[in-house]
UniProtKB/Swiss-Prot annotation:
Pfam families: Actin (PF00022). Gene3D superfamilies: 3.30.420.40, Actin, Chain A, domain 4 (3.90.640.10). It is found in: Cytoplasm, Cytoskeleton. The lineage of its organism: Eukaryota, Fungi, Dikarya, Basidiomycota, Agaricomycotina. This is Actin. The gene is ACT1. Keywords: ATP-binding, Cytoplasm, Cytoskeleton, Hydrolase, Nucleotide-binding. It catalyses: ATP + H2O = ADP + phosphate + H(+).
Amino acid sequence: MEDEVAALVIDNGSGMCKAGFAGDDAPRAVFPSIVGRPRHQGVMVGMGQKDSYVGDEAQSKRGILTLKYPIEHGIVTNWDDMEKIWHHTFYNELRVAPEEHPVLLTEAPLNPKANREKMTQIMFETFNAPAFYVAIQAVLSLYASGRTTGIVLDSGDGVTHTVPIYEGFALPHAILRLDLAGRDLTDYLIKCLGERGYPFTTTAEREIVRDIKEKLCYVALDFEQEMQTAAQSSSLEKSYELPDGQVITIGNERFRAPEALFQPAFLGLEAAGIHETTYNSIFKCDLDIRRDLYGNVVLSGGTTMFSGIADRMQKELLALSPASMRVKIVAPLERKYSVWIGGSILASLSTFQNLWCSKQEYDESGPGIVHRKCF
């Protein structure tokens, strides 16, 4: 492989797709992982109507489209739509010919084997990639933080995972998945605001609430105390201007929505919170490596962007861990994109160049080659 050809790095999340070139410090393209199809054929006269729209274009035309997310809870469930997203990524966003660049894709922890094979097949057969690699998202986040051992709490839009990693290898028996992430918090905030008399119903309005969540929500260090403060004074209230000019006031919802990460019962879920899930994940690991994991808890993904989340994690994990344990929460500023950044770092390492799975190897061995080359 020639040095001058940059590898493409694509991180496909449930909510957003991040894509760009290896060696860059940030993704060039970040767009919603959605595919939209017209609700009614032939309504838009003379629009030169397409049968499908992807990403921002689908988002902006959502009034006349049915929107679908091909990635649910981090796992690809609709391959035809996924292919459309990849096509859009190569040709419209990055404007590259995929047959000229090695491609690094990311996958969810515990991704079914058949899924990796399908990914591999599409990259080689549909897009004719010269070389391909698939890496686990959380492992890339850990690399981006400059570590090879630690536990990653990766929480995005569709799913949250705790992934213990030792010397660069994820420990599958100790990986835990929590089906509670950004989208659920947005829905819960919609419910909280609805109770206050601010109804948000359409998919378009849901995007407004997502923005409110991202701009105004935070994690309280002491939830009960914060609820009391909010009840006694208006010091925690903030106002938000809706697109139509109406101004709404948001109070305890600011910290009630993200609190669901620590108390899933708020959403009616019988699951452990992110602090307890992290603890359980560490507990499933060998005694000898637990100290290294407690000392390197790395946050990753957009849902870990709430202010106050690291301090709260520190407090909760300290309460659960053995008495003499040193707990350190690492919250890199760029954690929203750390999976992509880790991929960019990995794919540009000189030592990585002989790890790619080549088209020739694929032609000789078939899709199963991915299990031997990528782990």
